[in-house]
From Swiss-Prot:
The modification Deamidated glutamine is found at residue 66. The gene is pup. Belongs to the prokaryotic ubiquitin-like protein family. Residues 23-60 are annotated as: ARC ATPase binding. There is a cross-link at residue 66 (Isoglutamyl lysine isopeptide (Gln-Lys) (interchain with K-? in acceptor proteins)). This is Prokaryotic ubiquitin-like protein Pup. The lineage of its organism: Bacteria, Bacillati, Actinomycetota, Actinomycetes, Micrococcales. The N-terminal unstructured half of Pup provides a signal required to initiate unfolding and degradation by the proteasome but is not needed for pupylation, while the C-terminal helical half of Pup interacts with ARC to target proteins to the proteasome. HAMAP family: Pup. Strongly interacts with the proteasome-associated ATPase ARC through a hydrophobic interface; the interacting region of Pup lies in its C-terminal half. There is one Pup binding site per ARC hexamer ring. Is modified by deamidation of its C-terminal glutamine to glutamate by the deamidase Dop, a prerequisite to the subsequent pupylation process.
Length: 66
């Protein structure tokens, strides 16, 4: 096996063509409002977790045979 070279069946010159990246579409006011609502919700969750994460997690822990 020493001295044997493996040859690829496809030539190296043919590289995979890279697809053009999609052009970002300007967001509509409705989409922007939706994103703002999600951001507000995530900020609220972050606030709850920062202030009382232990209590928040305890609410999801199973107790006994529940």
């Amino acid at each position: 096996m020493a001295g044997q070279e493996q040859q690829s069946s496809s030539p190296r010159e043919e590289e995979h063509e890279v697809a053009d990246a999609p052009v970002p579409v300007p967001s509509s006011p409705q989409a922007s409002a939706h994103t703002d609502g999600v951001d507000d919700l995530l900020d609220e969750i972050d606030g709850v977790l920062e202030s009382n994460a232990e209590e928040f997690v305890r609410g999801f822990v199973q107790k006994g045979g529940q």
